[in-house]
């Protein structure tokens, strides 16, 4: 019997290679590798190079992290350094993560 695992699709909107952008990406990758290893897809979008994508997704500030799948869409704007706030803000609660680990 195969166990279906959710895949999380995330988009990180940054403005160039600024210290805030680099820090946001590094922090997010750490969270994702520790909590969601193998069950996420992350797309990094530079709004300076792709302003139309930011406009389409109504991104007004950077860094912005958006969880696209599974629904509902959730967004976090600004500092991503607080792991718990990121997980709760994206509706990715610790209990769900731990249940997945126990099912593996």
Swiss-Prot record:
GO BP terms, alphabetized: circadian rhythm
Disulfide bonds: none
Top-level taxon: Bacteria
Coiled-coil intervals: none
Protein keywords: Biological rhythms
CDD domains named among the record's database cross-references: KaiB_like
SUPFAM superfamilies cross-referenced by the UniProt entry: Thioredoxin-like (SSF52833)
Entry function: Key component of the KaiABC oscillator complex, which constitutes the main circadian regulator in cyanobacteria. Complex composition changes during the circadian cycle to control KaiC phosphorylation. KaiA stimulates KaiC autophosphorylation, while KaiB sequesters KaiA, leading to KaiC autodephosphorylation. Phospho-Ser-431 KaiC accumulation triggers binding of KaiB to form the KaiB(6):KaiC(6) complex, leading to changes in output regulators CikA and SasA. KaiB switches to a thioredoxin-like fold (KaiB(fs)) when bound to KaiC. A metamorphic protein which reversibly switches between an inactive tetrameric fold and a rare, thioredoxin-like monomeric fold (KaiB(fs)). KaiB(fs) binds phospho-KaiC, KaiA and CikA. KaiA and CikA compete for binding to KaiB(fs), and KaiB(fs) and SasA compete for binding to KaiC, thus the clock oscillator and output signal pathway are tightly coupled.
Notes concerning its domains: Has 2 forms, fold switches to a thioredoxin-like fold (KaiB(fs)) when bound to KaiC.
Family: Belongs to the KaiB family.
Complex formation: The KaiABC complex composition changes during the circadian cycle to control KaiC phosphorylation. Complexes KaiC(6), KaiA(2-4):KaiC(6), KaiB(6):KaiC(6) and KaiC(6):KaiB(6):KaiA(12) are among the most important forms, many form cooperatively. Undergoes a major conformational rearrangment; in the free state forms homotetramers as a dimer of dimers. When bound to the CI domain of KaiC switches to a monomeric thioredoxin-fold (KaiB(fs)). KaiB(fs) binds CikA, leading it to dephosphorylate phospho-RpaA.
Protein's name according to its UniProt entry: Circadian clock oscillator protein KaiB
Organism: Microcystis aeruginosa (strain NIES-843 / IAM M-2473)
